[in-house]
Amino acid sequence: MVLKAGLIVNDGKELAVQTASSVQEKLEKSNYEVIRVSSSGGMVGFANPDQHVRPLGYTNCVPEGFDSSMEFAIVLGGDGTVLSAARQTAPAKIPILTINTGHLGFLAEAYLSNLNEAIDKIITGNWDIEERTCFIVSVMRNDQRRWESLCLNEMALHREPLTSMCHFEISIGRHAPVDISADGVILSTPTGSTAYSLSAGGPVITPDCPVVQLTPIAPHSLASRALVFNDSEPVTVFPATPERLVMVVDGNAGCYVWPEDRVLIRKSKHSVKFIRLEDHEFFQVLRNKLGWGLPHVAKPNK
C-alpha cells in the first residue's frame, strides 16, 4: 500500500530546497507518495494588506491533497515557516515534523545534523504527538467577516509609523471592558508567550496552560501590565483611534484594521499537532534557545 506524506518547504531558502529534495527521495524509496508545497501558501495577506476580504476563511490555506489520508507532513525552514505550515495542516489534523534550516529554531524538533535519524524514526512510526492550541483571528465590520486567519503564536495590533499613540477598548468574555493606551496590543497563545509578547515584557507560559495572554506594547501607564486569562473567553478588540491600524498574525499574515472594524479572537477547535521524536522538556528548550535559568556567573568545574 502506498502511504502519503506532505513536504512543506521555504522555497525562498536554497538550503531548505536542497534538503527537501533528499528528504523526498528517501520517503519515496520507503513507498510514500510525497506532495510537496511551498510554505508561502500559509501566508495570508501579508504582502498585500489592502486586499482585505477573504470570504473563504482560514481553511482555504490547506493545500490540495492535504487531507485525513496523509500520515504526516515534514516542514523544512525556520520558525516562520513552521508558523505558515501550521495554517496549512491544522485544519486537516495532519501531524508535522519540523526540521530547522533557519536560525533560532525554537519550534524545531530536528536539525540537519540528525536529519537521517529523524526521517528513519518517522518512517517506522517511532514518534508521539504534542498538540498546541491555536486561535482564530477575525476582522469584523458589523456582521461581515472581512478577514480571518489561524494563529499559533500571536495577534499584534499596532499603529503605523509616524502616527500617534493608539487607544483600545478590549472586551474579555463577560468581564468589564479594559481600556488601554499604548503603541499596540498583543494577544498570544502559550506557544506565543516566548515570541513577540516576551519582548514586550510578558511572562513565559508553559504550552499546556489553557490561557490567553494580553500584553500592551509600550503602554502609557505604569499600571498597564500583561494579563493572563482562561482561553474559553472570547476577546474583542475595538480600536478607538481615527487612523487605520496594522494587524499582524504570527509575523507572516495580516491586514489593515480601520476604526469601524473590530478584531475577534477565540480558541480554535483545530490544534497544531507537533511530532515529537524524543522527550520534549519545555524548560530545557528555554534554557538551550533563550538562555533561561543559566547562572549569571560561570561556576568553576570540580
From Swiss-Prot:
The keyword Oxidoreductase appears for this protein: no
Top-level EC class: transferase
Location within or outside the cell: Cytoplasm
Domain of life the protein comes from: Bacteria
EC number: 2.7.1.23
Stored Gene3D superfamilies: Probable inorganic polyphosphate/atp-NAD kinase, domain 1, Probable inorganic polyphosphate/atp-NAD kinase, domain 2
GO molecular function: ATP binding; metal ion binding; NAD binding; NAD+ kinase activity
Reactions it catalyzes: NAD(+) + ATP = ADP + NADP(+) + H(+)
Protein family per UniProt: Belongs to the NAD kinase family.
Record's protein name: NAD kinase 2
Organism: Prochlorococcus marinus (strain MIT 9312)
Gene that encodes the chain: nadK2
